[in-house]
Amino acid sequence: MTSMPIRISSIDESFDRWEELLSLILSAFAYMDGVIDPPSSAHRLTVEGLAHKAREEIGFVAMNGDTLVGCLFCRPEAECLYLGKLAVVPERHGSGIGRRMLAAAEDLAHDRNLPVLRLETRVELTDNHRTFARWGFVKTAENAHPGFSRPTSIEMQKRLALG
């Protein structure tokens, strides 16, 4: 993949690359198969579901020229901005795309006067925990999916300086 400047933009009504976006998420989350239990909710996503998600939430895509290389969905909550489905194509992991999308989420939180970013990551994904910690997130809770008696995910938050 030729490296061009990465452009982060919001998903608007003109976005029509839903199948490509679904493929990106599935490929970015594929390494979790057989590692996390229960399996990732990404497996339940559909093209229609993603389009609905984009209408209900605020989506961002990362573009390398005309190539879709990342995405992030944000959902404003009462006291925070929830971040979900942060995905980067596997061959671009570690290239700063995720951090750039996080910066877009931080700008959105500032614009909405939301002082905290919140996300959830699976207990087993310790590399993700370390990455989010480097980005300023701290562990705030452990949660269990329905039917599980052990923690299956952790919540992490990042406090933002508003002003």
Task: Give the location of each predicted region.
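Conserved N-terminal entry element of GNAT/NAT acetyltransferase domains
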Residues: 1-16, 161-163
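Conserved GNAT-fold acetyl-CoA-binding loop/helix
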Residues: 13, 23-50
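A short helix-loop-beta-strand connector motif used in the catalytic cores of GNAT acetyltransferases and
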Residues: 49-61, 82
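Conserved beta-strand in the GNAT
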Residues: 61, 67-75, 82-87
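Active-site acidic-Proline motif in GNAT/NAT acetyltransferases
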Residues: 76, 89-91, 95, 123
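Conserved acetyl-CoA-binding loop-helix of GNAT-fold acetyltransferases
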Residues: 88, 94-107, 134
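Conserved GNAT acetyl-CoA-binding A-motif
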Residues: 109-121
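Conserved catalytic-core motifs of GNAT/GCN5-like acyltransferases
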Residues: 118-122, 133-155
